[in-house]
Amino acid sequence: PVIIPPVADSTVIINTLEHLDGLILTGGGDHNPLWMGEEPSPRLHNINQERDAAELMLVRLAFNRQIPMLGICRGIQTLAIALGGKVYQDIKQMVKHSQDADRSEPTHSVEIKKDSTLYHIYNSEKILVNSFHHQAVSEPGRHMRIIAKSTDGIIEAIESNEYKQILGVQWHPEWLGEEGGKIFQWLVNQAGNFHAAKQLHKRILTLDTHCDTPMFFPQGVKFDHRDSRILVDLHKMTDGHQDATTMVAYLPQPKIGESFSSKVAFDVQGPLQYADLIFDKIEEIVSKNRDYLSIARTPADLYSDKRKGRKSIMLGIENGLALEHDLSNVKYFAQRGVVYITLCHNGDNDICDSARGCNTHN
């Protein structure tokens, strides 16, 4: 096991996460409500800004990397805040949530949803837990869902609603002997699966054969910056251990009477020039990130880049409109490094009918 100190340097955290297969977020003091845009309640207890900042960053980075996570007590609250949720600064208690009994003594019940990871772990809709908290999750955030509550409605457990292996519980299973150990066994199993997946990625090459990121170039996206508007960027490729992607120059198909220039955001004379412009922009991205990116044209290039620790970009064209009725342009684009050209896309053209077209030729 690795104990991670409260480190503010994201590079240190990222490098640490590269060596981890699972993450436990432990109990502790209150969170600073300023993280949630709230002013402090008079009933707020001790806070630790340094720990808050480090753990919130840690969760977000681990989330992006699909690392299995278990949050305990404060840890469930850390999960919620980091992933867009909120926490009550001090709960109104109908059930005693800060017991005086021994830590190993369960003192109240928790009702569990049947379609949840927690139900799969315990095979029961109700379990008994211990309780040592005055704060609790109020909103799980858009990435998480509520899977267990106490009888007074306090959220006792949340999990990912995106099929990520993330679970948070408000109680302390580490004090509950064999019953509590079941949750830790779940994390061990998920960490084992994650480790196996990472080892698989080391042995094989993963190639995304189609990426629409260039469609967003007119909106100012940068491939070397994490951007929620696009599904593939350099950071997401790294997080997901993806080795290569094929960036396509998508050419919209004008209808009869429409000009091509009216369908695209850049000022170009025709489809070929537009495709060239997209490829120029991709090559500019690669040129600025040579330590991390390379243009690949062959399988040998792909495997060479993987050995060198670089991500590969291959080039493609979506819509044979780019050929401009000249078959010699097939050779031209091949020499530019284009690895495939689809004959059409979402409309009939002079080459063929589209599956979504109007049967122009047939």
Language-model region placement:
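Amide-donor transfer/coupling interface in amidating biosynthetic enzymes
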Residues: 2-21, 25, 48-65, 92-199
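Non-cysteine beta-strand/loop elements that form the S-adenosyl-L-methionine
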Residues: 22-30, 89, 339-346
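Glycine/threonine-rich flexible loop motifs
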Residues: 33-48
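Alpha-helix-loop-beta-strand connector modules within alpha/beta enzyme cores
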Residues: 55, 360-362
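A short helix->loop->beta-strand "cap" motif at the edges of active sites that frequently abuts
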Residues: 65-67, 311
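Gly/Ala-rich beta-loop-alpha elbow adjacent to hydrolase catalytic centers
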Residues: 71, 75, 80, 84
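N-terminal hydrophobic targeting/anchoring segments and the immediately downstream early-domain regions
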Residues: 196-360
